[in-house]
Each structure stands twice: as structure tokens, then as C-alpha cells.
UniProtKB/Swiss-Prot annotation:
Pfam families: Gamma-thionin. This is Defensin-like protein 230. Disulfide bonds join C30-C72, C41-C60, C45-C66, C49-C68. InterPro entries: Scorpion_toxin-like (IPR003614), Scorpion_toxin-like_sf (IPR036574). It comes from Pisum sativum (Garden pea). One of its GO terms (cellular component) is extracellular region. The gene is PI230. Keywords: Antimicrobial, Disulfide bond, Fungicide, Pathogenesis-related protein, Plant defense, Secreted, Signal. One of its GO terms (biological process) is defense response to fungus. It is found in: Secreted. It comes from the Eukaryota. The lineage of its organism: Eukaryota, Viridiplantae, Streptophyta, Embryophyta, Tracheophyta. Residues 1-27 form the signal peptide. Belongs to the DEFL family.
Amino acid sequence: MEKKSLACLSFLLLVLFVAQEIVVSEANTCENLAGSYKGVCFGGCDRHCRTQEGAISGRCRDDFRCWCTKNC
């Protein structure tokens, strides 16, 4: 019984450690409004951010504007 408890606790600590590392790695990006994207954002935002703004990715948000994700 004690071995099961120790194994379960070790697994839980490993999961928490990995989850913390994921949060830290995601925190190295910033999302900014695309500077040269014109018009309402329905599509093509990702391609625009990658090619024109030098960003990692782009997405249309709820406000129908193009937001680019860059390394901070």
C-alpha cells in the first residue's frame, strides 16, 4: 500500500512539474495588433502575420481584428 501511495505521489508531482514548464514556455510570446493588416479579419491573418510582420502566427479575435503572436 505504501509503494502505491509513493508511486501516485511521484506521478502527481511529475504532472505538476510538466504543467508548470508548459506555462513558463508559453509566457515567452506576446500578442500585438497587426500593424499593416487592413479591413475586417475573416481569414488570411495567420499568413499575413508570418509573411508581412515576421510573427510566429496570427489569428482573428472576437473584435474582428488581426492579432499577431511574436516572441517577446
